[in-house]
Amino acid sequence: MGTVTHEMLVHGFLEDSNLLEGVGAVYVLACDFLQTTQKYANRGYRYALLEAGHAAQNAYLWCAEQGIGVVEIGGFNDKAFSDLISLAYPHQAPLTTLLVGRRKL
């Protein structure tokens, strides 16, 4: 997968580079839809979205407990972002991202 630089994130994912100010890590919650739908048929798609939401919520709760800022970003170009992080789109795709380390607003 390799390293994704600040510039790559801005051009391939975020339009507002200010969102990355103070960010220590970017977590991408992604899914391999071939895996989930093979086991659960069409429900696999819904399950993946639910699980991503649960994981993001748990990350928010942990960050709040630790006093760490976190921002969830779900609005991005799926194909461009998948290419940036080497996912085999559309079978693999990012569902949401968490920018961790931002100061609390």
What name fits each language-model region?
Residues 1-105:
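Acidic, surface-exposed loops and disordered segments
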